[in-house]
């Protein structure tokens, strides 16, 4: 038997055990090919079946049709900070960015490096990004409105998306992709590094509306143009086959074991509530995000002192509860509870937290 | 028992069985962490140990010191076609490119997309790239000389590298990286998509000399600047952890099981000779590359008719010899025999080829 911990890492993060077991079982001989999935050609029928299945599952989960393309792009979400404006922000136009934390700040920085014009439509920097801004000063002529739907480090999440009066929303959903249903009619493009909710690190999923693709900027290097990926089903060059295979298995788990995004959302709400209720009932644990901006994915909290926080993380680790340290830029504690974190994991954490408060409070 | 075939795919390609077995055995619990390697944080001690080990092994294998950086970059070799000139070709300078096939042609195309100046120093296009050019018209002021060391599709390889009078060579070594010793003093940068000689698809290894890094172009998006990777040990953002782990195991195999690049080279020469000797002794099988330009990695050949080639590939497949079809752009047959292809695999192929000639010749 392998030892398994409850893994609260922010990403790379826990994956469903059944997915890991299937990868392991088939690792030397994938689908009767006599090859590992790491050895199969990306120009083969077995791999075509995988990538097509993944695309179909994403579309079905999100309820989108042929007006969107689902792309697999390397370079992580960080590469998208540059690719989004390269492709979607034409010269002479500007884009609105809402600054809700570290990742939004980086998205803005990369856009400016390209010499493009950014309008910061709102920011919550005044209170260390502890909330999602309510008032946005949007430019009706903006090429797009960029939003970080879930702020992994600050522990905040957009509960609803704003009405942008027809300007397409571009959203970094790295830390909450496929964790809840979405009204996709509001979005022009969403992107997400795989390594939190949908698979191992090594690919970024980009879902883009055809009309944006059609008017995208031209003259880009092939690997930096969305069109290259859209025209080739992400097979212009060798894709990260193993990672896409693992993602396909996670998507299958999401559809067939969980039962889709409504069900996933309900479970995620229940999981997060167990922790937030504990904070609200205790003076020992305190959440860092405003109540109306709390993330269902990254639950950030503080203990009465940094010493206690250090001991908390250490003792949790000894109890096989891993990854609870807050991001180095903010300190404190953080429990990342993405789709694959089970209710049992949350329950184990809650039990540990109560015991730790009893003995240290 | 898993079924295993002899896999002659051009990439993704065969990996050493012992590497696959180790990944499989540790897949649910990596190094006692209680997590899969796909779930381990890239900011953790266990992952640091992996990436540092990989870098150290590459340097030891190639006999290079701290004057080079070993980087892991996403996007495959195709992304390097653009990143090389973005970083290393300053405005007002030009670069020399030797055109030896499909991949060189693409490298040239991407450089031109960027509006940069290319001098084609030589080309073997006149005879469908069946040879490596001997005469190069090099520009002493070029920023670099770009060479595709092994032409995966055309089956040709540079046996030696030219004297470029101090101008650094930049080489796409996707299909022969770490297959033989190199005199690294000639090179400013080498790059290789992992999926042929060193691991699964999903990362490109870039080995670059510090002096080129120091004078590299600035003002690039973070993910497109080599400096970003060099300054962060390839951990600026989330790297493809699983792929880097697999590469580290392949490097360990290369050092500890094979015994380094001299040994690997000797084995590779022996393997290729078995096939080329067969061609030379037979009028049924004929190599497509000039004798002095033959690749030790991708052995391209023709049979007397396309019908026979089709039957050859089909019957080979039935005999568990996979991936022998030539690239769709050239036809014919191709046996890709990278580092991980065993002598037993070559012997099985040679036996099959003799039998096929006997019954169809
Ligand atoms: C919201 C968000 N955006 C972007 C990133 C950067 O992702 P990557 O490491 O894939 O570039 C992260 C990583 O944690 C994130 O949480
Ligand atoms: C020599 C060479 N260069 C570049 C490439 C493209 O590599 P990638 O698919 O990693 O972009 C290949 C792929 O076969 C290749 O053989
Ligand atoms: Mg954040
Ligand atoms: Mg409280
Ligand atoms: Mg070629
Ligand atoms: Mg012959």
Swiss-Prot record, chains A, B:
Annotated localization: Cytoplasm
Top EC class, one word: transferase
What remark does the entry make about the cofactor?
Binds 1 pyridoxal phosphate per subunit.
Question: One GO CC annotation, please?
Answer: cytoplasm
Residues that the record marks as modified (N6-(pyridoxal phosphate)lysine) are: 196
The UniProt record gives the binding positions of pyridoxal 5'-phosphate as: 77-78, 103, 152, 172, 195, 237-238
Instruction: Give the record's GO biological process terms.
Output: L-serine biosynthetic process; pyridoxine biosynthetic process
Question: Which residues are listed for L-glutamate binding in this entry?
Answer: 43
Query: What pathway does this protein act in?
Result: Amino-acid biosynthesis; L-serine biosynthesis; L-serine from 3-phospho-D-glycerate: step 2/3; Cofactor biosynthesis; pyridoxine 5'-phosphate biosynthesis; pyridoxine 5'-phosphate from D-erythrose 4-phosphate: step 3/5
GO MF annotation list: O-phospho-L-serine:2-oxoglutarate aminotransferase activity; pyridoxal phosphate binding
Reaction(s) the record says it catalyses = O-phospho-L-serine + 2-oxoglutarate = 3-phosphooxypyruvate + L-glutamate; 4-(phosphooxy)-L-threonine + 2-oxoglutarate = (R)-3-hydroxy-2-oxo-4-phosphooxybutanoate + L-glutamate
Q: Which UniProt keywords apply?
A: Amino-acid biosynthesis, Aminotransferase, Cytoplasm, Pyridoxal phosphate, Pyridoxine biosynthesis, Serine biosynthesis, Transferase
Which InterPro entries does this one have?
A: Aminotrans_V_dom, Pser_aminoTfrase, PyrdxlP-dep_Trfase, PyrdxlP-dep_Trfase_major, PyrdxlP-dep_Trfase_small
Pfam families assigned: Aminotran_5
Question: What does the protein in this record do?
Answer: Catalyzes the reversible conversion of 3-phosphohydroxypyruvate to phosphoserine and of 3-hydroxy-2-oxo-4-phosphonooxybutanoate to phosphohydroxythreonine.
Give the family per the record.
Belongs to the class-V pyridoxal-phosphate-dependent aminotransferase family. SerC subfamily.
Question: What do we know about how this protein assembles, alone or with others?
Answer: Homodimer.
The protein's name in its UniProt record? Phosphoserine aminotransferase
């Amino acid at each position: 038997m392998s030892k398994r911990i409850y893994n609260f890492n922010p990403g790379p993060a826990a994956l469903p055990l059944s997915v890991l077991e299937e990868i392991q079982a088939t690792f030397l001989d994938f689908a009767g090919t006599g090859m590992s999935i790491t050895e199969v050609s990306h120009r083969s029928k077995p791999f075509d079946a995988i990538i097509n299945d993944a695309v179909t599952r994403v579309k079905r989960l999100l309820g989108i049709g042929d007006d969107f393309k689902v792309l697999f792009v390397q370079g992580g979400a960080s590469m998208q900070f540059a690719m989004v404006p390269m492709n979607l922000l034409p010269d002479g136009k500007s884009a609105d960015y809402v600054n809700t934390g570290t990742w939004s700040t980086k998205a803005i920085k990369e856009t400016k490096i390209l010499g493009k014009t950014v309008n910061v439509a709102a920011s919550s920097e005044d209170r260390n990004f502890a909330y999602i801004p309510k008032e946005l000063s949007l430019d009706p002529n903006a090429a797009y409105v960029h939003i970080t739907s879930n702020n992994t480090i600050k522990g905040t999440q957009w509960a609803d998306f704003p009405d942008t009066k027809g300007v397409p929303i571009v959203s970094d959903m790295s830390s909450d992709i496929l964790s809840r249903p979405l009204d996709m009619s509001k979005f022009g493009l969403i992107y997400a590094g795989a390594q939190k909710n949908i698979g191992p690190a090594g690919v970024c999923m980009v879902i883009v509306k055809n009309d944006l693709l059609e008017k995208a900027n031209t003259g880009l290097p092939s690997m930096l143009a969305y069109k290259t990926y859209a025209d080739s089903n992400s097979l212009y060059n060798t894709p990260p086959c193993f990672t896409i295979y693992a993602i396909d298995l996670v998507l299958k788990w999401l559809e067939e074991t969980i039962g889709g995004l409504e069900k996933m959302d309900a479970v995620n709400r229940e999981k997060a509530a167990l922790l937030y209720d504990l904070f609200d009932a205790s003076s020992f644990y305190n959440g860092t995000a405003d109540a109306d901006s709390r993330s269902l994915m990254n639950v950030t909290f503080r203990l009465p002192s940094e010493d206690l926080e250090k001991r908390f993380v250490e003792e949790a680790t000894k109890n096989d509860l891993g990854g609870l340290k807050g991001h180095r830029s903010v300190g404190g504690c953080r429990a990342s509870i993405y789709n694959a974190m089970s209710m049992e994991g949350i329950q184990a954490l809650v039990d540990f937290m109560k015991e730790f408060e009893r003995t240290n409070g």
